Regions:
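Hydrophobic positions on the alpha1 helix immediately C-terminal to the Walker A/P-loop
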Residues: 35, 39
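Hydrophobic anchor at the beta1->P-loop junction of P-loop NTPases
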Residues: 24
């Protein structure tokens, strides 16, 4: 059973006074349903679970009066074998985007405040304009992502104490013993090749069979393509899929990882395809890393909406866009050139995205300085360079020297920990999970 960090959020939610309904957001197949079901099993006596895709007739419960008493009575007739007791029963409405009246009902569950209600579903189908009264102010949100590297380590049997020991080297900025470092790099390469989609991770834990992993990844990708075909407007269907499938080429097959419309279609232009990128973003199928024209806080003030990199929301999906041999090269550490640098940059971006950071990158055509990724942490800008080899980070060194308000920067490498006098903290790639 895969342990997820989202469970801790849910436990805190249970103990919140005057708690609201909880909406679990996130892309498809990231473990939302599984996590809620396991949470209910461990914390409640009873679970009322309605999946509106599997049980469309259950929408009738929400077709009349939306008083809590009326809805509970409808559930009791629908599930006579279940007990619905305040505080002891969790009501879980899954695939809620299929039932707009159920979305509206969240306000009344929250006002009544007797029953614990969690809802989940893809963002794709929720048409806010069709919901007669979207429950603004009556819901809390939990964003779920694919499995991150620390969760992957838990699944591989690495205990919390072992991870705490590893983090001790990070805090003290001392070299990780080679036996530990080498094994961690092996785990990290496995994680990159597998990605964080729970089905793929569980299959690897059970079988260690990369052919099976590949099959699952491709099936997941087909599911995302189906969602584009099912939910996108007629105008966006083909364009959005073209943009999505181009991501592997954008990120791995060229040195410049900026999203270029010409890679989507010969002669492609922003005027034609930008709305498709916006649709993919709203659908939780991509996340963006925007160019900034300055390295000062607040980076968002200097961000350009028209100049960005677009990443898949999990590495599993990126792997599915490439040949099986890429996974072999990653695990065996035999990648070279643009693919190696691109893969590591994607892995670092993936980790930061799953931590909830907005991502930026910097490039100055005049000075030729460029920074792979920039985030804001504890009120300061943190520049990050990703090196496929242990090469110099001249741009990072220059930025730190010229900006006193940027106290440090990270250089992530296929190597061990090191600290320089110029504020550059060199870390192994896997340490991105723990900063």
């Amino acid at each position: 059973m895969l342990k997820r960090k989202a469970t801790n959020f849910m436990k805190n939610w249970i103990n919140t006074k005057d708690k609201k309904c909880l909406i679990v957001q996130g892309a498809r197949q990231t473990g939302k349903t599984y996590t809620v079901e396991r949470f209910a099993e461990e914390n409640y006596e009873e679970l009322i679970e309605i999946n509106f895709k599997q049980m469309p007739s259950a929408m009738e419960i929400f077709s009349g009066d939306l008083t809590v008493d009326a809805m509970v009575m409808g559930m009791r007739f629908r599930f006579p074998e279940k007990k619905i007791i305040p505080g002891k029963t969790l009501i879980f409405l899954d695939e809620i985007q299929e039932c707009q009246e159920a979305v509206t009902s969240l306000k009344f569950w929250a006002i009544d405040n007797k029953y614990d209600v969690i809802v989940s579903g893809s963002l794709l189908g929720i048409d806010y304009k069709r919901a007669s009264s979207y429950p603004v102010g009556y819901v809390d949100y939990l964003k779920m992502y694919g499995i991150d590297f620390e969760e992957f380590l838990w699944g591989m049997g690495i205990s919390g104490d072992m991870i705490e020991n590893l983090c001790g080297y990070l805090r003290s900025k001392t070299i990780v013993p080679e036996a530990i470092h080498s094994q961690m790099m092996n785990y990290y390469r496995q994680y990159i090749a597998i990605g964080g989609m729970p089905e793929a991770v569980q299959k690897y834990i059970d079988t260690k069979d990369f052919r099976e992993i590949d099959r699952i990844q491709r099936s997941l990708l087909q599911g995302y393509q189906y969602d584009i075909a099912h939910y996108a407007t007629a105008e966006e269907k083909v364009k959005a899929e073209k943009c999505y499938i181009s991501l592997a080429k954008q990120l791995l097959d060229k040195e410049n990882h900026k999203f270029q419309y010409k890679e989507v279609e010969h002669g492609g232009r922003a005027q034609k395809y930008f709305s498709s990128i916006e649709w993919l973003l709203r659908a939780d199928m991509v996340h963006l890393c925007k160019l900034v024209t300055d390295v000062r806080f607040d980076l968002d003030d200097y961000a350009r909406d028209d100049f960005f990199r677009a990443y898949t929301t999990d590495l599993s999906l990126l792997m599915a866009m490439k040949d099986f041999s890429l996974k072999q090269h990653i695990v065996e550490n035999t990648l070279f050139g643009n693919s190696k640098g691109g893969i590591y940059e994607c892995a670092i971006a993936d980790a930061l995205y799953k931590k909830g950071y907005p991502l930026y990158f910097y490039k100055n055509e005049t000075t030729k300085r460029k920074i792979d990724v920039m985030i804001q942490k504890d009120g300061v800008v943190v520049p990050i360079e990703v090196k496929s080899g242990n090469t110099r980070a001249n741009s990072l060194k220059s930025i730190l020297k010229m900006n006193a308000d940027i106290p440090y920067g990270y250089k992530f490498v296929d190597g061990n920990i090191g600290v320089s006098d110029d504020g550059i903290i060199t870390l192994p790639l896997y340490m991105i999970a723990f900063i």
